[in-house]
């Protein structure tokens, strides 16, 4: 997909999206040095050149959590208007992919502000960009589907997000955000490497699809104390729930009351056998497995986004995507902290539907997972986008305070880590629900043969991944024979 997006940028140019050769002769401050803009563009990545009105810089105030809460965040983030041009070097020409025009509210231009919580405390800030006119800034060739006003600039993170979204896609979660590596120049100062990314929001065409009038996107949020509107968590008051849709200044009192009931019923259900009435088990299992694959060592910051399509009784709570990989690859030989802190009640529940789905998702992908990730990373490294990113690392190091290494080293670091993680995870999940453990008692023995026959006769519940001994997707008499062979051998 990354290669596809990068090629689309080139195709857009070939189809005449750009205008005449751009004037890129202006100078840009890169750390303590000065460079010509065209030299930055020549590295190959798109360059977001942002000039705000009167060269005003986005600012924010920093706040710490009140007593009894956790984390630190920002407030009073200024929304600064300006103009944004996206340049890219194609062939021998510096060309314009996009020009927002000068700022005119609801007509042209854009605004930029600092975003994030602890991520906003570093020298390199993450930003939110809001266009005054919708545009697909990734140029995927279908403007009607992908255009939007809201975009993010996430800090370069050594390919953690690249792999994280690949895992998201492999798990077939409802939405995988798309992004592109870019260089950013703000008011004549080179800010370094970023990921220009879709934001988490309602957009039924290309992001999260919930009903416009009765749908919800919400987050179990450790930074709830920095929001004006939230609903309470009864089981974990340090993690109340805040809203992405409707936005906090648009949500009505009756909607807030409804969502308090939804959240309370959801939390209460997790300790009993009827949780399947409240949650979409497939997406919950995929989300948890995703962070277990990633080895995420952050139970607070790894954003737990939820959505509910509408307010009908048949609409279950989903977990639509993985997000925030700052603490990925931090634990090679233990479960992710989210697994332990937020999902343990589902793993321990007498209703084994969640465990069955979790194990099944892994068994569907485990044989090819490591080779898929390795091939994906190596392909990215050799792609035109990978080469452009590699060429830009030296400049990023000048402003981000690190000694740049070759992209190949970043790629191999990821591959080595996932090889180790894969081995540990595979052993742990196999032990959790062994193939052939028909009665889910943690052991495979002769009683499982009788239980599997009961499953075939319809007198026992089919835990489909444990029961499907031969892995052909069908629970049948052949599985009985294979189970006998398994026990004999």
Residue locations for each model-derived region?
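Middle-to-C-terminal accessory/interaction subdomains
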Residues: 45, 56-58, 122, 242-434
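Short, well-structured beta-strand/strand-turn elements
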Residues: 171-183, 296
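Internal "kinase-insert"/substrate-recognition segments embedded within catalytic cores
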Residues: 130-136, 144-158, 172-177, 189-289, ...
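Regulatory N- and C-terminal appendages and interdomain linkers associated
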Residues: 12, 23-107, 385-434
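Cellulosome-associated attachment modules in secreted, modular CAZymes
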Residues: 430-489
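Bacterial N-terminal signal peptides
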Residues: 7-16
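Conserved oxyanion/phosphate-binding beta-strand-loop segments in alpha/beta enzyme cores
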Residues: 82-155
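Positively charged n-region of N-terminal signal peptides that target proteins for export
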Residues: 1-4
């Amino acid at each position: 997909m990354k290669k596809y997006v990068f090629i689309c940028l080139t195709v857009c140019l070939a189809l005449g999206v750009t205008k005449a050769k751009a004037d890129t002769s202006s100078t840009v401050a890169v750390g303590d040095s000065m460079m010509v803009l065209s030299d930055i563009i020549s590295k190959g990545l798109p360059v977001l050149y942002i000039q705000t009105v009167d060269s005003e810089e986005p600012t924010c105030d920093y706040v710490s959590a009140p007593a009894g809460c956790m984390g630190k965040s920002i407030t009073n983030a200024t929304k600064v208007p300006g103009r944004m041009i996206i340049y890219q070097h194609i062939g021998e020409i510096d060309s314009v992919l996009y020009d927002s025009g000068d700022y005119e509210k609801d007509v042209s231009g854009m605004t930029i502000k600092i975003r994030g919580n602890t991520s906003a405390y570093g020298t390199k800030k993450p930003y939110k960009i809001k266009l005054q006119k919708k545009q697909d800034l990734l140029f995927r060739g279908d403007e009607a589907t992908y255009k939007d006003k809201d975009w993010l600039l996430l800090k370069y993170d050594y390919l953690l997000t690249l792999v994280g979204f690949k895992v998201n896609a492999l798990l077939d979660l409802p939405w995988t955000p798309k992004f592109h590596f870019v260089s950013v120049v703000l008011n004549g100062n080179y800010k370094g490497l970023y990921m220009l990314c879709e934001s988490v929001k309602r957009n039924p065409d290309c992001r999260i699809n919930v009903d416009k009038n009765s749908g919800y996107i919400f987050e179990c949020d450790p930074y709830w104390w920095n929001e004006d509107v939230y609903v309470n968590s009864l089981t974990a008051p340090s993690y109340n729930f805040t809203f992405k849709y409707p936005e906090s200044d648009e949500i009505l009192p009756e909607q807030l009351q409804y969502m308090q009931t939804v959240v309370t019923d959801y939390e209460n259900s997790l300790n009993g056998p009827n949780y399947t009435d409240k949650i979409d088990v497939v997406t919950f299992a995929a989300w948890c497995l995703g962070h277990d694959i990633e080895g995420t060592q952050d139970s607070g910051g790894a954003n737990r986004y939820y959505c509910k399509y509408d307010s009908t009784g048949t609409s279950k709570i989903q977990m639509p995507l993985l997000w925030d990989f700052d603490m990925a690859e931090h634990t090679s030989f233990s479960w992710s902290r989210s697994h332990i802190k937020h999902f343990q009640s589902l793993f321990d529940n007498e209703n084994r539907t969640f465990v069955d789905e979790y194990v099944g998702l892994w068994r569907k992908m485990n044989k090819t997972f490591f080779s898929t990730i390795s091939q994906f990373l190596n392909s990215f490294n050799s792609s035109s986008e990978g080469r452009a990113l590699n060429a830009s690392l030296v400049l990023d190091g000048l402003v981000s305070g690190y000694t740049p290494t070759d992209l190949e080293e970043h790629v191999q670091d990821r591959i080595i880590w996932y090889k180790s993680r894969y081995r540990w995870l595979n052993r742990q999940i196999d032990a959790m629900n062994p193939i052939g453990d028909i009665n889910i008692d943690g052991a495979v023995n002769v009683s499982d043969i009788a239980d599997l026959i009961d499953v075939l006769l319809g007198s026992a519940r089919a835990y489909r991944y444990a029961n499907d001994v031969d892995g052909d997707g069908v629970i049948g008499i052949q599985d009985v024979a294979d189970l006998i062979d398994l026990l004999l051998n």
